[in-house]
Amino acid sequence: MDKIGVLLMNLGGPERINDVGPFLYNLFSDPEIIRIPFPVFQKPLAWLISTLRSTTSQQAYLSIGGGSPIRRITEQQARELQSKLRDKGLNATTYIAMRYWHPFTESAIADMKADGIDQVVVIPLYPHFSISTSGSSFRELKKLRDSDDEFKKVPMRCVRSWYSQSDYLKSMVELISEQISLCESPSKAHIFFTAHGVPKSYVEEAGDPYKQQIEDCSLLIINELEKCLGHSNPHTLSYQSRVGPVEWLKPYTEEVLADLGRSNVNDLIVVPISFVGEHIETLQEIDIEYKEIAEQAGIKNFRRVKALNTHPTFIEGLSDLVISCLEGPLVNLEEASQLPEKVKLYPQEKWQWGWNNSSEVWNGRVAMIIFLVLFIELISGSGPLHKLGIL
């Protein structure tokens, strides 16, 4: 019987306060996160941004216990999935590849080679595909695989996205229903989906399918929820976690919360739709920051749906994904990372800083200049900002 390696790809997160700076550096060193015209500046810019953001980010992690639980939860998911697959008769072993913190993809590849894996199934722990999440992880894996003659021989199948998988939808409905049942008027509870945002240009200029998949997913969940409960609930979708000067997907979560408060919404069921495990954006951004905004807006009951973590129905769905991937049409690593064709005035492969026709580029260029000036001053210890007493 073939030895199957199931590779679960995720973001990663700092486990201790001292990890925050290096984690941010790894994050912003990724050109899928920040696109600049000259690659030589990528790492200096990443160092600058991570240095400037470290203190604030450390405070956020301190508020949830001093570190991210994402590794612990992902390891639990991997163990549960491995057990489920073996119960179904597969000789499967799960591995974890984090993009920006330990255990990195290189470590997972080394472990699979040492274990003599015969074929690999790759599942990103992002239900919806995006350039900056699954896409970045797929491309990192491809780069490492292409440079490893031994690992390159191992057959590999990939799951690109899985937001419409039946058990995933069912598990989301089960968790949402739990919170709705706690409301005084369940049919009036407002379902508030909040997804991690991406820059608008990713969708409009590069063809990222993320926005469409998020919208489709939220409607699928609402339809299944209505079947389960026997009534429909009002619902809204928003996007959170934007950073930088460019425009991100709208509407923004904090703005929608204020609008819902003005509309006299009392019971709000917050659904973190793009996260399958608890981490900084659920535990701190939603549970602390957005809850405070909601309460200030007059929303009386703010209820956040738990992340899927190791929900049994969710783990069952992941196991079915693995089996379907093994039995279905081959999707290789190259295909998994591809973007759909889009008609535009410039080549899609040249979609990067300075090549699209959006005014956001100019905002980005200005920000780039500011970052570089600040970087030079931090290194040199002199300049106009020092003379003004800003630095």
Swiss-Prot record:
It catalyses: heme b + 2 H(+) = protoporphyrin IX + Fe(2+). Keywords: Cytoplasm, Heme biosynthesis, Iron, Lyase, Metal-binding, Porphyrin biosynthesis. One of its GO terms (biological process) is heme biosynthetic process. Its EC number is 4.98.1.1. GO terms for molecular function: ferrochelatase activity; metal ion binding. Fe cation binds at residues 196, 281. It holds the Pfam family Ferrochelatase. InterPro entries: Ferrochelatase (IPR001015), Ferrochelatase_AS (IPR019772), Ferrochelatase_C (IPR033644), Ferrochelatase_N (IPR033659). The keyword Transport does not apply. It is found in: Cytoplasm. Catalyzes the ferrous insertion into protoporphyrin IX. This is Ferrochelatase. It comes from Prochlorococcus marinus (strain MIT 9215).
